Regions:
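Short hydrophobic beta-strand element within catalytic cores of glycosyltransferases
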Residues: 346-349, 359
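Conserved acidic donor-binding segment of nucleotide-sugar-dependent glycosyltransferases
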Residues: 361-362, 366-374, 382-388
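Conserved donor-binding/catalytic core segment of Leloir-type glycosyltransferases
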Residues: 194, 234-253, 259-263, 276
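Carbohydrate-associated surface elements
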Residues: 199, 220
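A short, well-ordered alpha-helix in the C-terminal region of glycosyltransferases
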Residues: 391-419
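Nucleotide-activated donor-binding/catalytic signature segment of Leloir-type glycosyltransferases, i.e.
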Residues: 288-311
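Short alpha-helical donor nucleotide-sugar binding micro-motif in glycosyltransferases
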Residues: 307-308, 315-320
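Acidic donor-binding loop of glycosyltransferase active sites
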Residues: 318-332, 345
Length: 431
């Protein structure tokens, strides 16, 4: 098959891009021809298709009034993207199009490329976040509270609650985008939506998507991650034990809750146990101030190591005693947890979104209530006791590795996905 994969970012930015590039790798292993459609950017990985990538767009920086008007229009519908995608389709002649992150920088205008209708090309969309039912995509309102207000299709709630970064203008633009896509029936042009978690599928159905349009397929792990899980070597740093948070330092990730909980626990924790925070983001200064205010002991026991390469992150995950997923928002199917499991590192995870589908109390980790310092504090104390019980800890490590090997096979995912591709091709072409 010839497959076009679509994603706004063409470099390893986050979990969506891990999936996007992993998909290309897995499909090529099976002998399929893969092409890309993305946004231009200085960090992009080289691609033979880059001459048709869309112009870079940044909706977060300061802009003049004419720029804002232009941005508002192209955010909702990009004529440039439609025309360039049509040119790519004419050149590649795809059998299937598989979209990932496309809203705002690319837009769903590409679904109007005439080639798709003329040649009955099936389109899939992997739902990495909640943009299909929430203009703010994380199902949090402007105050950072969990929010289901737009599930009934009334997207004016986004503007009313200033859900996008507390900004009336940005929330209004997001609302207009959602209303426009609903009015045009854009999502009806997608043949299958892939939900990586059962929770995601349930929310899409609550948001009005037909059950037959949404298929659950848990994300896969790349082969090197699977190889790491199969290796089974315990690389935990027993001499210098630490808990590990890795990810974006943002409010929805709950890193502030984690720091507060760890500081609260310091008098009760083993003297050697540290907290390592890997990543960067808007909450970094707040976290640094919390640590400094807590005094010298906290400063000695909490380390911010900043952004880490993939290789460095794997080393951190392998050596950590426990990883922490303290999210406030409804995470979909976090790759960070799968990568920790593959390293034999159990996880303390918030009971929210798709996290409980991965982190099961007493089996693959420990659980806590989202955004609750006391609950996370108690989970950390339970984790400290677990680490000291080497037999119970080793059993949990084995459970984590088994989960990845049994549930996250790249080969099986690719075979299931290509079978779905073929089913849609046959259906659309009347075979």
């Amino acid at each position: 098959m010839k497959i076009i994969l679509v994603n706004k970012f063409h470099y390893l930015k986050g979990g969506s891009e891990t999936y996007y590039f992993g998909l290309a790798e897995g499909l090529r292993v099976l002998g399929h021809e893969v092409h890309f459609f993305a946004m231009e950017g200085p960090d992009n990985i080289s691609s033979e298709d880059s001459d048709l990538f869309v112009s870079a767009k940044d909706y977060n920086g300061p802009t003049s009034l004419p720029q804002k008007v232009s941005a508002a229009t192209s955010l909702i519908y990009s004529k440039e993207a439609k025309e360039k995608f049509q040119a790519l389709c004419e050149r590649v002649q795809p059998d299937v199009v598989h979209m990932n992150l496309v809203h705002r920088q690319i837009t769903l205008s590409i679904l109007d490329a005439p080639y798709l209708k003329q040649h009955r090309v099936p389109v899939l969309f992997t739902s990495h976040d909640y943009i299909l039912v929430c203009p703010n995509y994380v199902m949090l309102d402007g105050s950072g509270n969990l929010c289901d207000a737009c599930l009934d299709g009334h997207f004016g709630n986004c503007l009313k609650r200033k859900c996008v970064k507390g900004s009336t203008a940005k929330s209004g633009m997001a609302m207009l985008e959602a209303e426009y896509l609903k009015l045009r029936g854009s999502y009806k042009k997608i043949d299958r939506i892939v939900a990586p978690s059962q929770f995601m599928r349930e929310k899409l159905l609550e948001g009005g998507f037909p059950a037959q349009q949404v298929v659950y397929m848990q994300n896969f792990a790349k082969q090197e991650i699977l190889d790491n899980a199969a290796d089974g070597t315990d690389r935990t740093d027993w001499d210098n034990p630490y808990l590990l948070f890795f990810g974006r330092l943002s409010s929805e990730k709950g890193v502030d809750v984690l720091v507060d909980a760890f500081i609260k626990d310091l008098p009760s924790l083993p003297a050697k146990l540290r907290l390592v925070i890997a990543g960067d983001g808007p909450e970094r200064q707040n976290i640094e101030e919390k640590i400094a205010a807590a005094g010298a002991v906290a400063s000695d026991r909490i380390e911010l190591v900043g952004f880490q390469s993939s290789a460095d992150m794997q080393r951190h995950a392998e050596k950590a005693s426990l990883a922490i997923a303290s999210s406030r928002w409804r995470e979909n199917m976090p790759y960070s947890i799968v990568e920790a499991f593959a390293s034999g590192t159990p996880v303390i995870g918030s009971e929210i979104g798709g996290i409980p589908e991965l982190v099961v109390e007493g089996q693959t980790g420990l659980t806590c209530k989202p955004g609750d310092v006391d609950s996370l504090s108690q989970a950390i104390l339970r984790g400290a006791r677990l680490i000291e019980n080497h037999e119970a800890y080793a059993a949990m490590q084995a459970n984590c590795r088994s989960y990845v090997l049994e549930r996250c096979s790249q080969e099986k995912y690719m075979k299931d996905l290509t079978a779905l591709y073929q089913e849609l091709i046959d259906s659309k072409k009347g075979n």
